[in-house]
């Protein structure tokens, strides 16, 4: 019976390791996301940065900043152990395409630098953000990535309603 239990534990450990994303895969995913997000910002006309498809929803620039700022907070708090994001976008420049693009690129640069420099113990370190239960840095990064993909997808109609074909998605494989 003990042998069966030990074998089951070993199989579970192997299955978990097989599912685990490597640090390089995380870096590759975040670099690809950076490319995709910057392509969306580049595609949207300057005149449409404040465009919103209906009243009461975020405009295009606000949508981008919403998830990009979250990515920055996750990197700063979960990877670097800071209390808050190390920089923000000047809100007076929110709807200036060049400023939005620069902020977005800077955030992804910060996140990627923090991720590339993270040790295995930093990736496993538990932290709590947004009054939610503590999670590992890797889990926070995955949740932030998912949030960014979801929110970027919401901007497709913003582009189309301004006569812009959304940029093609860069496949990971």
Question: Where are the regions a protein language model picked out?
Answer:
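Short, contiguous alpha-helical
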Residues: 27-31, 35-38, 48-89, 128-173
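Sec/Tat signal peptide C-region and signal peptidase I cleavage site
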Residues: 14-20
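Bacterial N-terminal signal peptides that target proteins for export
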Residues: 1-8, 17
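Short, low-complexity N-terminal intrinsically disordered segments enriched in polar/charged residues
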Residues: 20-27
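Acidic/histidine-rich alpha-helical segments that form the ligand environment
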Residues: 93-128, 136-150
